[in-house]
């Protein structure tokens, strides 16, 4: 679904956008959020993309960065402590309409002894229905239950918990084609159509528990504006409980902006561009982490997919894994090699000043990268079970592809295709499957990152 319940049923929302005066105008203009628009039809013939890709999900062509009134593109306002609900909106009484589904913006009714809410479709791996529990111990084992100690430089005494993904299921899907704007894309809305159908048919995500924001919809609350995106992010994580499974999917333009708080070793924050970014500004990774990651309690799964450029660390998750399932850390050897090459080059020229300057620059860069990495583990580690799949590294672009005559994002296609071919894969197997789907056509490298140290040999559940 792609509408919101009235504010009396939805207390959350970003306090900064739109301003209070604009909120009042919007409430006067839209006295109720109305009925949901018709659902997207199922998308068939999801075939491999053609080559070459017609475009890139990079920066929208424009002079400079979009205007914004603060370092992170939003008007600052007092924020509640992490783990608390966002400020209340002024209540108002909408016209009478049937009540929304209990799962949409509300806690589901209590059903003691009802068992897990999700048992999986045939072939889909769950913690209780997979090859490993049926005796094939060469298959990926399901995630453990209970708390797991962190280690790996995380705060001492801290623990996290894997989600078994049997609880409440909610999804936020955002696709922006930027109609009528420079840098218009073609496949982002199709990505949302395909993903919503896949989640509904294969993982039992109910349509009424999906918020869909695309710029082809007439309902103003369904447009992917900055205000709507931020409000929907708050809705997604509201009232989350252990073993819930939340899903976030963004397909659109992504980019980078100078980092102002020192949490990025390359000096740039990753951003996404709402449909109204030229007026409202972009959304920075720090803000997405604050809204969608930090409030989550232990045992809640958030699966995030960013099919956009420069998206490798779009949620600022500190644990990034290679296709060998190994935790990536700052590559000091690579930096050392580059630094040594510069020193040797300067020595060969007899330029002692440059040699010293190059050596000192390398030391500072390597030290800064290691310090940033350690600080990220201390401040961005989470007890929740947050997994992010991104279409490219921070320095790469992502392809806007054509799939059997239909425009779509390469990562969105590869993710669904890889899971359909083999639903019972470990994390590292799925990462390699996605990479293999992309490898024959594109240079982009998919990324897997997590909010906690991850055993990549465990069964991937969702």
Swiss-Prot record:
Entry keyword annotation includes Transit peptide: no
Active-site residues (renumbered): 253, 309
Alphabetical keyword list: Apoptosis, Hydrolase, Protease, Thiol protease, Zymogen
Record family assignment: Belongs to the peptidase C14B family.
InterPro entries per record: Caspase-like_dom_sf, Metacaspase, Pept_C14_caspase
Lineage, top ranks: Eukaryota, Fungi, Dikarya, Ascomycota, Pezizomycotina
EC number: 3.4.22.-
Species assigned in the record: Coccidioides immitis (strain RS)
Source taxon at top rank: Eukaryota
Protein name as annotated: Metacaspase-1
Ranges of compositional bias, category Low complexity: 22-33
């Amino acid at each position: 679904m792609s509408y919101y319940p009235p504010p009396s049923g939805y207390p959350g929302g970003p306090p900064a956008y739109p301003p209070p005066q604009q909120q009042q105008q919007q409430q006067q203009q839209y006295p109720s959020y109305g009925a949901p628009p018709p659902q997207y039809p199922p998308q068939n013939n999801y075939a491999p993309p053609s080559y070459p890709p017609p475009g890139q999900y990079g920066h929208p062509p424009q002079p400079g960065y979009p205007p914004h009134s603060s370092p992170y593109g939003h008007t600052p306002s007092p924020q509640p402590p992490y783990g608390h609900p966002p400020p209340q909106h002024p209540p108002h009484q909408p016209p009478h309409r049937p009540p929304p589904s209990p799962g949409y913006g509300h806690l589901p009714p209590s059903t003691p002894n009802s068992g897990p809410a999700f048992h999986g479709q045939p072939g889909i791996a769950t913690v209780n229905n997979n090859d490993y529990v049926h005796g094939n111990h060469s298959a990926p084992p399901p995630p453990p239950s209970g708390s797991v100690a962190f280690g790996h430089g995380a705060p001492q005494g801290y623990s996290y918990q894997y989600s078994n993904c049997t609880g409440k299921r909610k999804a936020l899907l955002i696709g922006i084609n930027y109609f009528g704007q420079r840098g218009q894309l073609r496949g982002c809305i199709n990505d949302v159509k395909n993903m919503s159908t896949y989640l509904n048919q294969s993982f039992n995500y109910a349509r009424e528990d999906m918020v869909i924001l695309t710029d082809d919809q007439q309902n103003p609350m369904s447009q992917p504006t900055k205000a709507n995106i931020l409000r929907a992010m708050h809705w997604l994580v509201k009232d989350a409980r252990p073993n819930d499974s939340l899903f976030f999917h963004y397909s659109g333009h992504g980019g980078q902006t100078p980092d102002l708080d020192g949490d990025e070793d390359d000096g740039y924050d990753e951003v996404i561009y709402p449909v109204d970014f030229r007026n409202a500004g972009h959304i920075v990774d720090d803000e997405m982490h604050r809204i969608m990651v930090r409030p989550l309690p232990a045992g809640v799964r958030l699966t995030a997919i960013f099919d956009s450029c420069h998206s490798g660390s779009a949620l600022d998750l500190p644990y990034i894994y290679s296709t060998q399932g190994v935790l990536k850390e700052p590559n000091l050897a690579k930096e050392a090699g580059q630094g040594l090459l510069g020193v040797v080059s300067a020595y060969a020229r007899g330029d002692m000043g440059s040699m010293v300057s190059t050596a000192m620059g390398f030391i500072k860069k390597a030290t800064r990268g290691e310090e940033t990495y350690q600080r990220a583990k201390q401040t961005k580690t989470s007890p929740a079970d947050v997994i992010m799949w991104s279409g490219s590294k921070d320095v790469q672009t992502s392809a806007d592809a054509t799939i059997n005559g239909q425009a779509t994002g390469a990562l969105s296609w590869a993710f669904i295709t890889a899971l359909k071919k083999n639903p019972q894969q470990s994390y590292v197997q799925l990462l390699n499957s996605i990479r293999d789907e992309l490898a024959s056509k594109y240079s982009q490298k998919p990324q897997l990152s997590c909010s906690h140290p991850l055993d990549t040999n465990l069964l991937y559940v969702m």
